[in-house]
Amino acid sequence: METNIIELSQSLKISQKQIEKVLELTAEGNTIPFIARYRKEMTGNLDEVEIKAILDLDKSLTNLRERKATVLAKIEEKGKLTEKLRAAIEAAEKLADVEELYLPYKEKRRTKATIAREAGLFPLARLILQNAATLQEEATALTNETFPTAEAALAGAVDILVEAISEDVQLRAWTYHEMLTNSSIVSTLKDQDLDEKQVFQIYYDFSEKIADMQGYRTLALNRGEKLGVLKVSFENNVDKIIRFFEVRFKVKNDYIHEAIQQAVKKKIIPAMERRIRAELTETAEDGAIQLFSDNLRNLLLIAPLKGRVVLGFDPAFRTGAKLAVVDATGKMLTTQVIYPVPPAKAAQIEASKQDLSDLIDQFGVEIIAIGNGTASRESEAFVAEVLKTHPNVSYVIVNESGASVYSASELARHEFPDLTVEKRSAISIARRLQDPLAELVKIDPKSIGVGQYQHDVSQKKLSESLDFVVDTVVNQVGVNINTASPSLLSHVAGLNKTISENIVKYREEEGMIRSRDAIKKVPRLGAKAFEQAAGFLRIPESDNVLDNTGVHPESYPAVEKLFQMLAITDLDQAAQEKLQSLDVKKVAADLDLGEATLKDIIADLLKPGRDMRDSFDAPVLRQDVLDIKDLQIGQKLEGVVRNVVDFGAFVDIGIHEDGLIHISKLSNSYVKHPSQVVSVGDLVTVWVDKLDIEREKVNLSLVAPRESN
């Protein structure tokens, strides 16, 4: 463990003391959100991402150390472990390097070289290396039933040399670094019929130095190859590699030359190509997962539209649009099916206008949330037409990715057992606008669709990363224990699926939970679960104002003492002024609290019941529909960032297809990655840069035309 702590500290640039505390707190059963929020003094104010990085790297280093121990033991069993080899294995920083060092000592399947050694041809292989003048005679003397001629014996000796050369650790390492530096990845078209939409067109004749490969290109090549569209290969300087080997072995005969040719071309280069492809893929996957995670976090933090009556509009052509009205709390008021777009007849469309208008009037609808799937553009035009007679009502295009997944789920069936899948979907679309976080947690994050190549990466790693993001955001925002669904509650630190369901059942049977202390009455919610969860659960109905803040119950006595010190009885303006003027260092010492903890407590007391999402951008409300034909080059528009990818960002500007801001158009200065400039959910001012009306493609710029280079 001590070795891990030193390496963790060096790799993460975090002090050993901080790392020791994180590992100690985790071993005691504390969760990442709890440690980050309520144990700041112990960890030196590390956040959730830093804590997770410590735990992930600790696990990785432990796996590496265990593999080293296994490899060392196996080599020692064979009696071939030297001090030099031991030192090399112990110094290896990657599993791949450990496996390279282990390769010559691994149990092998029966090979040509194995057969040649068993036939006693190893001395002949040594003579070839020594360039002995009597090779033919020596080979003849070693003939046998398996190798009946001198040439056959020499060929067997060459097989031994091929294996020995191909397993030479130093030569393999040199080749690996040579290829990393100078080789290129090449792709060519294999079958255009499998690429009808020409998605992979730029890769039909593609070449890129390995050192310059971008992650999204690696994943695109992998997908194109998997689909049979592309053939992917390497372009290597084979002659340079062979010359290096020949100098190393001081080649003086054709047999050594042949052994090197075979070892390089058939063994070492293919092995290094596999390793490099695997490493490129792993790096690309990690980048894609991180990007998806960042996008998901920003999506979950989009400001909720609280206290609004919303009509969810799930568009469709033939089967009709499904509508659902939900009240300000998200409770379903009614559902309906209308036929607002062709192939519906004109009379049906007119009747649908009246139906929608009646729903708006009857329930006081303030916003219409339109799903962005099939028939979305036509439905948007229909809604905009109806809203001409309802000037106080707006609409928003909502990303409906995953809504169909939710509506067919067991959870949706439990929530709305009497509704069709489509009507459940309309409710989900409406609720996504009211409270994106509460609704999106009901869906597998992978279905939300704010990544790139998410289906081409390790699904286990993706799930772990996205689950961490959801857990982090849910706990940072806090959860109303009296209104939250089991899905939302299950992401609260210390709670699991069973306890979350028990909380909902307890509410249904016993009524509203009116204090944090009452949470302890929930079945299966023990002392540890309470400790971890309590600070993240909000109770607006409680008589104790602290129960609706992020202040943990363990700090209540200190807060009561603080109130006595400041003569505070109510959190009015006078109390807030007193709290703002505190000498934090002195008061923290008086209360036996850490300064970081006291600062958090004061922040909560100044804004009890605050929602951190309120400081983020809210969705753009629209009343008029915009058509791509209305756009002009240089036109200024307002939009919302829908997705961030490696090559740019997609922005909803109110037309059917999102516009693309290429990375080169994000700034006048160099941008390494789009996420440095924009995030999902950001409200942005953009200018139309290029238009392709026929293909319905719009390129945008974040730089005003007069400012661009």
Give the residues covered by each predicted segment:
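Low-complexity, acidic/Ser/Thr- and charged residue-rich accessory regions of DNA metabolism proteins
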Residues: 138-150, 209, 228, 240, ...
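Short beta-alpha connecting loops at secondary-structure transitions
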Residues: 19, 338-343, 367, 408-421, ...
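Long, charge-rich intrinsically disordered scaffolds of nucleic-acid metabolism proteins
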Residues: 97, 396, 402, 407-477, ...
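Duplex nucleic acid-engaging cores and interfaces of nucleic-acid transaction enzymes
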Residues: 50-53, 64-74, 78-312, 316-418, ...
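Accessory alpha-helical DNA-binding modules that contact the DNA backbone or grooves
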Residues: 31-32, 43, 47-148, 476-615, ...
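Long, charged amphipathic helices and adjacent flexible linkers at domain junctions
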Residues: 275-293, 447-480, 586-633
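A glycine-rich phosphate-binding loop feature that marks nucleotide/adenosyl-phosphate handling sites
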Residues: 177-185, 313-317, 373-378, 398-405, ...
